[in-house]
Amino acid sequence: MNIFALFEARVRDAVEALTRAGHLPEGLDLGRVVVEPPRDASHGDLATNAALVLAKEARANPKALGESLAAELRADPRIVEASVAGPGFINLRLDPAIFHAVVRDALEAPEAFGRARLPGGPINVEYVSANPTGPMHVGHGRGAVFGDALCNLLVAAGRQVTREYYINDAGVQVDVLARSAFQRYREALGEPFAIAEGLYPGDYLKPVGARLAETHGRALLDKPEAEWLPTVRETALGMMMDMIRADLAAIGIRHDVFFSERTLQESGAVKALLAELRAKGLVYEGRLPPPKGQLPEDWEDREQTLFRTKEFGDDSDRPLLKSDGSYTYFASDIAYHRAKYLAGATELIDVLGADHGGYVKRMQAAVKAVSDGKATLDVKLCQLVRLLRAGEPVKMSKRAGEFVTLRDVIDEVGRDAIRFMMLYRKNDATLDFDLAKVVEQSKDNPVFYVQYAHARVRSVQRQAREAFPDADLSVAALAREADLAVLSDPGEIEMMRLIAQYPRVLESAALAHEPHRIAFHLYELASALHSFWNKGKDLPQLRFVNATDRKSTWARLALVEALRSTLAAGLAILGVTAPDEMR
């Protein structure tokens, strides 16, 4: 049950009633009308901006319109009080039975509770797409966790999602990888080797060299580069992708599709794209003005094959061919996004590092062009991650050619800490990740605080079974028998309110593509539970389990089970475990 959607519909009914009565003009735009929690919980359970956003179009005084709407809403028996505050906000206080119904809904259908059915076609989410030239670093991990949680969130909101990884295996960097691996092959055979400037120096390529030596012996040594390069490249790429897949699996990241850039080019998709754009009149031969500021060393004033991206909102037109006649990265990227659209996706989401900020407008313009406006692209940029230890910066490089990898961090703090903390800040804000703080058992460590709330409910349930060994304490029995009307303490009411807010949080997070909203709400739920627990330490009558008060115990067991299942559902979206015990 989503009470916000329920009462938003009720507010719309009130507007329609005033329209039928001739007090409001017909055809008002209700698109900006929302029902949300009030800023101050003492003002009520819900608030709506209906009078404020409709007043101008209706040529009415916002406060007077608010009073008229409030009068209509008071006729609903589920609304105990409707009052106008400030310039025209309407605050609603609900019959407690509404919140009792939410708790029972969470108990009776925990798998469905909070889930939405948002409209829309298939979505393609591309995330990680790290170059297959070495181990993943912590920045890759942030994009990976964000993308995976976003997919989980969209699925929970009823959307059809394809999870995709784009393997950049066609650029210059993979030839550099092969040449670097060849030197490790020479090393494995005891031959002189040199990691020249421009090659990848890391020890992570030593196993590649050993594999090549084991497979080919000395057969590659005397061959010219043109002959050994494809063989070495395939082995190195395969082993790098195996390493990346293993790191992703270690933090629970999964993909449905691994799409190869090389297969895109070999299939003729880029050539077909250019032909299509030419047929649409979107490609021309021309010159670009010099870029502002200091000119790059490789800039040339020459005639180029240009894509008319300015017509679709970009800052300038973009080249599709390099001076040597090969395709630009942009041309390949357009062909790749065209392939996603042709595969059926009408909404595309790219999760990229913050250094791709200049890429957004041109790619959105390209998607609009190749889909004739039928597909959209949302680019989510993930800012940098700063590694700290007890507040002090961690040196990111360990030795020449080596750096702190995602696997290093996984091994030190574990999957749950990484996933929760990567999502406990908005993706476009820099994240300080403190290796010491994320394993603390304190309120200041959000992942511990939320997981401990889940474990604490399980502890309460074990206590209840000890106190009432012969009672049926199953979830079904609690949903059927608990008298939730006895829940009147402000702490109990706050827990019910937060449970009721979860469906709205999930839906709004999915619409905004912002999984951090789930993490924030879980912390609020955990905080409400822990606060009430602490009250019970001083006031025995407020303890969750009271052997002499079966009625209150049953009601509180029902309440905390609803809260626990909500925590578990939210943690599942984040990809974090919901432990029954904390050790």
UniProtKB/Swiss-Prot annotation:
Keywords: Aminoacyl-tRNA synthetase, ATP-binding, Cytoplasm, Ligase, Nucleotide-binding, Protein biosynthesis. InterPro entries: aa-tRNA-synth_I_CS (IPR001412), Arg-tRNA-ligase (IPR001278), Arg-tRNA-synth_N (IPR005148), Arg-tRNA-synth_N_sf (IPR036695), ArgRS_core (IPR035684), DALR_anticod-bd (IPR008909), Rossmann-like_a/b/a_fold (IPR014729), tRNAsynth_Ia_anticodon-bd (IPR009080). CDD domains: ArgRS_core (cd00671). The keyword Oxidoreductase does not apply. GO terms for biological process: arginyl-tRNA aminoacylation. PROSITE patterns: AA_TRNA_LIGASE_I (PS00178). It is found in: Cytoplasm. The keyword Cytoplasm applies. GO terms for cellular component: cytoplasm. SUPFAM superfamilies: Anticodon-binding domain of a subclass of class I aminoacyl-tRNA synthetases, Arginyl-tRNA synthetase (ArgRS), N-terminal 'additional' domain, Nucleotidylyl transferase. It catalyses: tRNA(Arg) + L-arginine + ATP = L-arginyl-tRNA(Arg) + AMP + diphosphate. A motif ('HIGH' region) lies at residues 130-140. Pfam families: Arg_tRNA_synt_N, DALR_1, tRNA-synt_1d. Its EC number is 6.1.1.19. Its main location: cytoplasm. Transmembrane segments: none annotated. GO terms for molecular function: arginine-tRNA ligase activity; ATP binding. Belongs to the class-I aminoacyl-tRNA synthetase family. NCBIfam families: argS. Monomer. This is Arginine--tRNA ligase.
